Design a protein with these regions (language model features):
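Mg2+-dependent endonuclease catalytic cores in nucleic-acid-processing enzymes, primarily RNase H-like
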Residues: 1-94, 115, 120
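Charge-patterned, long linear interaction tracts outside catalytic cores
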Residues: 95-122
Length: 122
């Protein structure tokens, strides 16, 4: 439920001192509920697929992306299993079990970089 999710998000905000939360622009009702009912404010994620993936690849190649392989085992497994569809004209990732955790990482990392004016290429 939204209430359970909000409680979990608030716990993580407090535990990790989180300043920014990015949300899929398709989840506007959740964004509104979070703000109105739970005082959790989210920004719409920048959802550029190829640019976001490229930003993550740079962090990985530079060894600047840390995974808690115990607490983040599912996300780590998804990131290392992510595949591109070889049967499309334009580069497009395969939509499978990896998609949601990888999209969440992409949204968070790329949105934070762009909105904070941080360059991963420096």
């Amino acid at each position: 439920t939204t209430s359970e999710l909000a409680t979990h998000v608030k716990d993580k905000i407090d535990e990790w001192n989180i300043d920014n939360i990015y949300i899929d622009s398709a989840a506007q009702q959740v964004k509104a509920d979070f703000a109105y009912d739970y005082d959790i404010y989210c920004e719409n994620a920048i959802k550029s697929v190829n640019d976001g993936i490229a930003a993550l690849q740079v962090l990985i190649e530079k060894d600047n992306l840390y995974f808690d392989t115990e607490g983040g085992a599912h996300t780590y497994s998804a990131m290392t299993s992510y595949k591109w569809n070889p049967n499309t004209e334009k580069p497009k990732p395969i939509h499978d079990w990896c998609s949601h955790p990888c999209d969440a990482m992409r949204y968070a990392i790329y949105s934070h970089q762009k909105m904070s004016n941080i360059s991963v290429y420096a």
